[in-house]
Design a protein with these regions (language model features):
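Active-site rim/adjacent substrate-binding subdomains
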Residues: 1-134, 139-176
Length: 176
């Protein structure tokens, strides 16, 4: 297993729609293992394949409390088949560093996909699980949490992020 590099905003791959996986072969299974390790190392509770530079319809997640054994889940080619209600919850994203915002989402969702053995699965989630599933499936559609907040908050984050990137690349000197 390997820890993969997480793509961060404004990497263009994050805005690309992921393609379905047509065959669950050894390379897909290795990607699943690497994504799980990367998610835990980050640390995070969900990760979509395009966040690690692979535009494939694949997500991993684990919302198990920290004081309990890990229990990662995998969904290949997931799709939301039903949703209802609404909720707002503060979210963060491994691809949107150092930023948290209230995001409005459905309160309950049902998602259908395949597990890592290629078996059909259906997940019904509410609360945090519903948020994680919607957040990760958004990634597969090229949608970031930034796209779900107000234009003002988005503009402020983009400005701050550009400043961070310039500073990190040595293009802007730090004040002495």
């Amino acid at each position: 297993m390997a820890v993969l590099e997480i793509c961060t905003y404004p990497n263009p791959i994050l805005k690309k729609k992921a393609v379905p996986i047509t065959e669950i072969d050894d390379s897909v299974l290795q990607l699943v293992e690497d994504m799980i390790e990367t998610m835990y190392q980050a640390p995070g509770i969900g990760l979509a394949a395009n966040q690690v530079g692979k535009p494939l319809r694949l997500i991993v997640y684990d919302i198990t409390p920290k004081d309990q054994p890990r229990n990662p889940s995998v969904l290949i080619n997931p799709e939301i088949i039903s949703c209802e209600g609404s909720q707002s919850q503060e979210e963060g994203c491994l691809s949107v560093p150092e930023y948290y915002a209230e995001v409005k989402r459905h309160a309950r969702v049902t998602v259908r996909g395949l597990d890592s053995r290629g078996e059909p699965v259906e997940i019904c989630g509410e609360g945090l699980l519903a948020v994680v599933l919607q957040h990760e499936l958004d990634h597969l559609e090229g949608v970031l949490m930034l796209d779900r907040i107000s234009a003002l908050k988005r503009a402020l984050y983009k400005k701050r992020r550009q400043k961070q990137l310039k500073s990190n690349d040595g293009l802007v000197s730090s004040p002495s």
